[in-house]
Amino acid sequence: MEKKNTYSKWMAVVLLACVCGLVSCRAEYEVAKVEGTRVAMDATWDAEPDKDALALLEPYKAGVDSVMGEVKGVAAVSMDRFRPESPLSNLIADVLRQAAAGVLGRPADVGLVNVGGIRNVLTEGNITTQNIYEILPFENSLCVLTLGGADLKELCANIAARGGEGVSGLNLVIDAEGHLLEAKVGGQAIDEGRTYTVGTIDFLAEGNDGMAALTRASQRQCPEGATLRGLFMDYVERETAAGRKIEARIEGRVVMKK
């Protein structure tokens, strides 16, 4: 099956026409007109590749291709990413939770990844280094956070407001308007009197994508060099060494009631 490339193929071009008026000795500008168009980023702009540029890159191309084409494992099924729950976001959230357990030296309660950070699908068949880079192109790194029960409840509400994200260890029921109806950790109701551990990425730990509750973590451990892409690649290699194919499915972790 052909790998699906979901990167944007369009570039927006906006032209601003300004008028200038003089006020005292200073020029003032006002926007008079805005025009926009979309330019397709395709072979039209590279119909005749620059021969000198190609010659410059050629000595490096074979080396890069050999690294990026290396097979790390095999996907048993195709896995996509979408809300409220998807196979690929489940898998990556599981990887984060497992990695957090390695940092803590004990099981972590929750894994969390933003669907928007997963940039491509994982299709059935061989998994190459290039595939993993296409899925996780950003330099996001592991952060292990400790949250109080009340803050974890708020985090679940943050996730509901987004229409769902990739979670591990959580079971959420939300509605189409983004309201949290029910939240459980490990099959149990959240206890506001205890603390919980969350394995996520630094981007979310900083409160981005609406995850404000994560900024109130009482403890925060972010191991240097523990990129999400590297953790995922390590996971694929471990599973392959154990003779297992990579597989994940929708399990009812985030259920949207209509």
Model segments located where?
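C-terminal motif of bacterial Sec signal peptides marking the signal peptidase cleavage site
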Residues: 21-24
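Acidic/histidine-rich, surface-exposed loop or edge segments in extracytoplasmic proteins
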Residues: 66-83, 211-217
